[in-house]
Amino acid sequence: MKRDYYEVLGVSKSADEQEIKKAYRKLARQYHPDVNPGDKDAEEKFKEATEAYDVLSDTEKRARYDQMGHSAFDPNQQGFGGFGGDFGGFGDIFDMFFGGGGGGGQRRQGPTRGNDLRYDLTITFEEAAFGTEKEIQVPRQETCTECHGSGSAPGTHPTTCSQCHGTGQVKATQRTPFGAIQTARTCPACNGSGQFISSPCKECSGKGTTRKVKTIKVTVPPGSEDGLNLRFSGNGEAGLRGGPSGDLYVVLNVKAHKFFEREGNDVYCEIPITFVQAALGSELDVPTLDGKVKMKIPEGTQTATVFRLRGHGIPYRRGNGRGDQHVRVVVATPTKLTDRQKELLREFGEVTSDQQQMGKKSFFEKVKENIRDAIDL
């Protein structure tokens, strides 16, 4: 039995879009197959989380799920179902009253669009930022090259189904408190095609499609983010009876970076500096997505001060320009001190007291003088 989608992601039913996305990203990184090779349990949890996110991240699907639960996406449910649920029961009744040969008897299943496919592609933080090209191997159903999708052996042709007489449906009479009602269902003999293949194609066993692995080049645009869904029209599975192919959806999974974090098009990082650098000022080599750049630290910098490097963030996916990089400096407290350094630190405390009482040189002026003495040790 399927678990509640909100329970799967660990969010409340009132969770907003960002909370749902954040919860999914956490689970996806934890259970992704690339992180847990050979772990079937992790793979199932990853699939479960992805299925839940697919529904809850879509406003329309989420509304249907909130109203009907999992049955909203069960193709076997009648009525207003989702994901393949049809209106067969209503169509039968409409045909009975408005023509259509009584119970939809004249309808035939025509060309059918191929299934859409999903492919999860893992890329690095840098590849997401600047874009990349990848070749992926996609297993899919393709039109049989031997019979060209007809399902019949070369030189033969399908014949009319003898069970449904080419209609693609068989009738059934149901007795109800309101009297007998005639309905129709898909013909089980021909699967709704209205045709019978007496000499199936040996290559595809009469299905009209064969399983192939297709190499597809995927272009990831600059500025892509985790969870981005890229659509490649016509690269899904082949359609049936001349129907169009489905689409391929490539969902990006961006690996976490060991140094950078991303919010929108801005990147964030944290750099430790020494007490000396904070007091006297310094120039640092700061890692960016473009390599190291110089950044000045002014005298008297406090811990947790954030500096901005303009234009060193993520490129905008639509339009020109880039976000910024935010650098948070953290003053590291020394843990191993020499006797001389301890002596100087005690003098710092005395300087502070003297400053308050005498109003002479500022604290940082005294600190800088004493630090310079310590450097000369």
Curated annotation (Swiss-Prot):
SUPFAM superfamilies: Chaperone J-domain, DnaJ/Hsp40 cysteine-rich domain, HSP40/DnaJ peptide-binding domain. CXXCXGXG motif repeats lie at residues 144-151, 161-168, 187-194, 201-208. InterPro entries: DnaJ, DnaJ_C, DnaJ_domain, DnaJ_domain_CS, HSP40/DnaJ_pept-bd, HSP_DnaJ_Cys-rich_dom, HSP_DnaJ_Cys-rich_dom_sf, J_dom_sf. GO terms for cellular component: cytoplasm. Residues 4-69 form the J domain. It is found in: Cytoplasm. Keywords: Chaperone, Cytoplasm, DNA replication, Metal-binding, Repeat, Stress response, Zinc, Zinc-finger. Gene3D superfamilies: DnaJ domain, Heat shock protein DnaJ, cysteine-rich domain, Urease metallochaperone UreE, N-terminal domain. Its main location: cytoplasm. It comes from the Bacteria. Zn(2+) 2 binds at residues 161, 164, 187, 190. The J domain is necessary and sufficient to stimulate DnaK ATPase activity. Zinc center 1 plays an important role in the autonomous, DnaK-independent chaperone activity of DnaJ. Zinc center 2 is essential for interaction with DnaK and for DnaJ activity. GO terms for molecular function: ATP binding; heat shock protein binding; unfolded protein binding; zinc ion binding. Belongs to the DnaJ family. GO terms for biological process: chaperone cofactor-dependent protein refolding; DNA replication; protein refolding; response to heat. Its cofactor is Zn(2+). Zn(2+) 1 binds at residues 144, 147, 201, 204. Participates actively in the response to hyperosmotic and heat shock by preventing the aggregation of stress-denatured proteins and by disaggregating proteins, also in an autonomous, DnaK-independent fashion. Unfolded proteins bind initially to DnaJ; upon interaction with the DnaJ-bound protein, DnaK hydrolyzes its bound ATP, resulting in the formation of a stable complex. GrpE releases ADP from DnaK; ATP binding to DnaK triggers the release of the substrate protein, thus completing the reaction cycle. Pfam families: DnaJ (PF00226), DnaJ_C (PF01556), DnaJ_CXXCXGXG (PF00684). This is Chaperone protein DnaJ. Homodimer. A zinc finger (CR-type) spans 131-213. Binds 2 Zn(2+) ions per monomer. SMART domains: DnaJ.
